[in-house]
Amino acid sequence: MKKAKMVVDRDFVIGEIDKRIYGSFIEHLGRAVYGGIYEPGHPEADELGFRKDVIDLVKKLNVPIVRYPGGNFVSGFNWEDSVGPREERPKRLDLAWFTTETNEVGLHEFAEWAENAGSEIMYAVNLGSRGPEQARDIVEYANHPSGSKFSDMRIANGKKDPFGIKLWCLGNEMDGPWQTGQKTAKEYGRVANEAAKMMKWVDPSIEVVACGSSSSEMPTFGSWELEMLDICYENVDYVSLHRYYENPTGDTPGFLARTMDMDDFIKSVAAICDAVKGKKHSKHVVNLSFDEWNVWYHSKEQDQEIWKQDKWNRALPLLEDIYNFEDALLVGSMLITLIRNADRVKVACLAQLVNVIAPIMTRNGGGAWAQTIFYPFFHASKYGRGTALNAITDSPVYSCKDYDKVPYIDAAAVTDDEGNVTVFAVNRDMEEDFELEIDLRSFKELSIAEHIVMHNDDVKAVNTEENPENVVPTAGKGGSITEGKAVINIPALSWNVIRFTAK
């Protein structure tokens, strides 16, 4: 059995974990809304048409914010289409996903769903086909009390009190050639700056997220952030990061090492933000919103076939990745990476939430179930709140195609006000268990409350409606703790949650 060591000291603090890093995302895309959260006539539908079984699963994840309504969708979206009497709302062609949007679910309906699910809305405005004026208008509609055109329109549409949306995205992936209204960094910086000013003039309490690069692989990554922030730095609060990983070649060790890239991406964007801060002699700190992250590749060929056969239909079954066990391991490592960067990453959204590259799947007229990636997110959201600690891990390493010195044990530690400690750990080793020694001597006397393990002998194992518990967490073997040092058995290829409680 291999060995690794970890030192967790209460005084080695990264920062407070913003609960919003456990956010998610619902886009008007595929069956995320229609046939996902919303299915009138389903046995589980409530009086609004929203599926209660889906809401129950979302509540279990305890998602504090949900980004909405896009995504690529938002760059061609007119917010006015989604309010007012449903029978008067127009049907529109969605150029982002080649489907027809009925606007049957709009802002008012989604706000009710979010409230029932225990979430707040992170609303994205259209800075693709539209501009600062329309962004200002939707803030007035959503947040201004009364006495103006758009606030009175909201009241006339049945919502007396403001929605009170506090976090807003200034467009989506505006550097991407696939985006409606693609812009250069300078073009976007000007539009984002003016939109942010006008939106905050309407409601000074809001925060806004500027579009960073669509991924770290974009040819303009780095220069985009520098040029854009040089224009809008003082008026924005966050820069967005988006990143998806894939494993089409079946290289599990290389796939599980991809969080090395994620960590580099975060640190690079944080450094750029700080460089602009220094250049401007500013006291304002711009932090990060990692508002799209996940594994995404399983459904791409299927999507191309769907578009060939059924373009412009409503609620096409797009981006319906079926996640396997190794995907859950990488999602666990991505959550660990977010925790370890809690000093700069203040918002993050698992993309997405239901049916579309999602932890929750449904069948029209049928059941709802948790995919493999549901469980690491559930554990992190439940136990990963409090203070992120700068845990020092000493682990054997391996090399793969893209990375050298990849630690077999990828881990993070969190403590709360009561002095309890939770360690999250992924064992990337395909063959061997690890004996993990965790030095906790700086804390008061602790006991091992629980060891949760997620493991499967088949890295391609999945959950289905017929077999929804094929890949699920189980009780681990635990371990011992003596004089402040714990020894825990970490199985090969596993996700682990080790909870210590103060005596």
Model-identified regions with their sequence ranges:
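Active-site His/acidic residue clusters
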Residues: 242-258
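Non-catalytic accessory regions flanking glycosidase/transglycosidase catalytic cores in CAZymes
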Residues: 1-224, 229-238, 262-263, 267-307, ...
